[in-house]
Amino acid sequence: MASDQTLFHYCLLTLYIIALPTWISLYFLQAPYGKHNRPGWGPTISPPLAWFLMESPTLWLTFFLFPSGQHFYNPKSFLLISPFLFHYFNRTVLYPLRLARNTTQTRGFPVSVAFMAFGFNLLNGYLQARWVSHYKDDYENEELFWWRFLAGLLIFVVGMWVNVRADKVLVGLKKQGDGGYKIPRGGLFELVSCPNYFGEIMEWFGWAVMTWSWVGFGFFLYTCANLMPRARATRLWYLEKFKDDYPKDRKAVIPFIY
């Protein structure tokens, strides 16, 4: 048990340590997939397969770890982990299927980037699953648990709705297109360039509220460090590609702010 506690604490420390370098590096150099795809990053695989493989630890590792937790027989632990699993079922299974069905582009996803994402999801999947199933210590505080869970769940559900809806719009534009990109319009796309990222940031803020933990907050913090610089780069990409046709008053990711 002591060795697992040590591993858990070092993994949590790692999650916080890598957040700032991630923000700084992605501010200057974008991961080469999607709109920012470019050569020079080694062999590639199909994007749907990449998404499936690199996101999968969040599912199988959670199912592997949960039975060994002291809260395995507590229904609240299953309730709490459900939004996390629901998000990653969409990201690991449904999203790659939508990509495979609707995308005609042949540009690959760098194996090196998928490998790094796989490593992060191992780290984060371990932390979130182990916290909920074993280390969380306030399940017995009924009032606090339910207030935090319901408030966080509301934020999470709204964020996931925004995220999935925006992803569907973007995938739909790929299906309509001739291999190129189009300006997304409607909904939150009128306010920000990347409502899909805004929705995901909302989700993990809601998760931080639900778990009420340094583990949940660390994931939210890292999500911001990963997605906000990419949203900024995506907005600049749109402005450069579409010039005056792209609305200059759209923010990158947070409506009216950033």
UniProtKB/Swiss-Prot annotation:
Accumulates in fibers (seed trichomes) during both their initiation and elongation phases. Also present in roots, hypocotyls, leaves, flowers and ovules, and barely in cotyledons. It is found in: Membrane. The keyword Phosphoprotein does not apply. It comes from Gossypium hirsutum (Upland cotton). This is Steroid 5-alpha-reductase DET2. One of its GO terms (molecular function) is 3-oxo-5-alpha-steroid 4-dehydrogenase (NADP+) activity. It catalyses: a 3-oxo-5alpha-steroid + NADP(+) = a 3-oxo-Delta(4)-steroid + NADPH + H(+). Keywords: Membrane, NADP, Oxidoreductase, Transmembrane, Transmembrane helix. Its main location: membrane.
